[in-house]
Amino acid sequence: MMGHRPVLVLSQNTKRESGRKVQSGNINAAKTIADIIRTCLGPKSMMKMLLDPMGGIVMTNDGNAILREIQVQHPAAKSMIEISRTQDEEVGDGTTSVIILAGEMLSVAEHFLEQQMHPTVVISAYRKALDDMISTLKKISIPVDTSNRDTMLNIINSSITTKVISRWSSLACNIALDAVKTVQFEENGRKEIDIKKYARVEKIPGGIIEDSCVLRGVMINKDVTHPRMRRYIKNPRIVLLDSSLEYKKGESQTDIEITREEDFTRILQMEEEYIQQLCEDIIQLKPDVVITEKGISDLAQHYLMRANITAIRRVRKTDNNRIARACGARIVSRPEELREEDVGTGAGLLEIKKIGDEYFTFITECKDPKACTILLRGASKEILSEVERNLQDAMQVCRNVLLDPQLVPGGGASEMAVAHALTEKSKAMTGVEQWPYRAVAQALEVIPRTLIQNCGASTIRLLTSLRAKHTQENCETWGVNGETGTLVDMKELGIWEPLAVKLQTYKTAVETAVLLLRIDDIVSGHKKKGDDQSRQGGAPDAGQE
């Protein structure tokens, strides 16, 4: 075979990379992503300004929001971005630390791969380390009393201090706590807190941030359909529909042949009678407000107005669900089936206000709302979007604590405690595995190290003294004060994080590192046919889909 042409198995326009080259490529991609985000950790974090393709601006220091906007080529970088999204959906906080940790885990593994250690050895050490990390975290966690308002505000505050909104921290903490407490829903001993669905954030530019508040009820961006309808109703009876109050046209196309002209008037009359019947079904229940997801014809408006009923049309389905939860109404699909128990009487006030140039309907002062609207005011759209992102994080933290009331110390303290525990355990280990195992402990120190770097203090001196501190008894709550860059006891500073967030961060970071270490071959697929003719033989870059 030596003299013959090499046998081509893969087609000519695919490119294959394998072995060490791929592994170091993946590790570098992950490190690059981690470096982008590194300065966004802690209370002294920097903001990033991103321009999207449409020319809009995003200004944020939320790890997930930054990575969402970045377009990357390398497949390993894509999976890094994916984990920050998972973290955001799962626990809503810790998106920055999960990326930094995963990047660091891969970075310490590179050294072993260079020494020809097999990736599987590194992986099994990482897995073992993860189990020990989880058990150590659970050991240092403390239970929390969720009914104590000050404690809860303190926890939310430690999540908010790293964000833009920290200037208004007490306002933001109260908003987040009230909103989450409102949408908390218990049945048969099962807690359900659905923030996405029932706690809506409405942003209205104008005013100042101090004007923001949580409404005990719902606000929608709609006006009444007829100018003479009432705009201020106390204790309204509310009917919610998801059908239209218009003449129903048949599903299939129908043709009517008219021979006499009286028939024509009869047809119009039938349409009118149909609408009148619909309205009468509603009017029987004597509601004050009718809200529907579909349209309301002029004639129906006329009948409703004569009965002194306010009508609001084309409301979003999600808003309608929220109104139903807030005032206790049921959404009805057919007006003729309306019954007394479908009417919502839980709201204390319906009023329509003009804010800026637009009209908003407020349904507030609900007796026992299970949905709420957070009204945000602020100078510009960019600020509002950032404040909204921060509030979402704060609400998620609050939700995590309510669902799983366990806390671990923040400020890099839990990382150092876990790292110390791992180092102690590795002393008893024999064989090659102890080195990658010890490296995990080293990787965990990236969190306190980054906190120290971001506030401009001396990294080496502080980290060494922090390590020394953690070797002493009962010092596992010592960490870095991100504001000043000094070492403090987190118990005194009152910076705590939910255990759920930390567990998820560690699991995700280690799993991702393991996943990327497993890859030893990248085959990039075909290029488009058009490209092929123009650049014959030029293989696409690794990672181009």
Curated annotation (Swiss-Prot):
The keyword Acetylation appears for this protein: yes
Gene Ontology CC: cell body; chaperonin-containing T-complex; microtubule; zona pellucida receptor complex
Amino acids binding ADP: G42, G94, T95, T96, S97, T162, K163, G411, G482, E483, E497, K502
E.C. designation(s): 3.6.1.-
CDD domains in the record: TCP1_gamma
InterPro entries: Chap_CCT_gamma, Chaperone_TCP-1, Chaperonin_TCP-1_CS, Cpn60/GroEL/TCP-1, GroEL-like_apical_dom_sf, GROEL-like_equatorial_sf, TCP-1-like_intermed_sf, TCP-1_chaperonin
Localization, UniProt: Cytoplasm
Residue list for modification Phosphoserine: S11, S170, S243, S244, S252
Residues the record lists as N-acetylmethionine modifications: M1
Region span, Disordered: 1-24, 526-545
Cross-link (Glycyl lysine isopeptide (Lys-Gly) (interchain with G-Cter in SUMO2)): K15, K248, K249, K381
Annotated residues for binding of Mg(2+): D93
GO molecular function, one term: ATP binding
Alphabetized UniProt keyword annotations: Acetylation, ATP-binding, Chaperone, Cytoplasm, Disulfide bond, Hydrolase, Isopeptide bond, Magnesium, Metal-binding, Nucleotide-binding, Phosphoprotein, Ubl conjugation
Residues found modified as Phosphothreonine: T430, T459
Catalyzed reactions: ATP + H2O = ADP + phosphate + H(+)
Disulphides: C366-C372
Modified residues (N6-acetyllysine): K222
A GO BP entry: protein folding
Assembly description: Component of the chaperonin-containing T-complex (TRiC), a hexadecamer composed of two identical back-to-back stacked rings enclosing a protein folding chamber. Each ring is made up of eight different subunits: TCP1/CCT1, CCT2, CCT3, CCT4, CCT5, CCT6A/CCT6, CCT7, CCT8. Interacts with PACRG. Interacts with DNAAF4. Interacts with DLEC1.
Stated family: Belongs to the TCP-1 chaperonin family.
Record's function text: Component of the chaperonin-containing T-complex (TRiC), a molecular chaperone complex that assists the folding of actin, tubulin and other proteins upon ATP hydrolysis. The TRiC complex mediates the folding of WRAP53/TCAB1, thereby regulating telomere maintenance. As part of the TRiC complex may play a role in the assembly of BBSome, a complex involved in ciliogenesis regulating transports vesicles to the cilia.
Protein name (record): T-complex protein 1 subunit gamma
Source organism per UniProt: Bos taurus
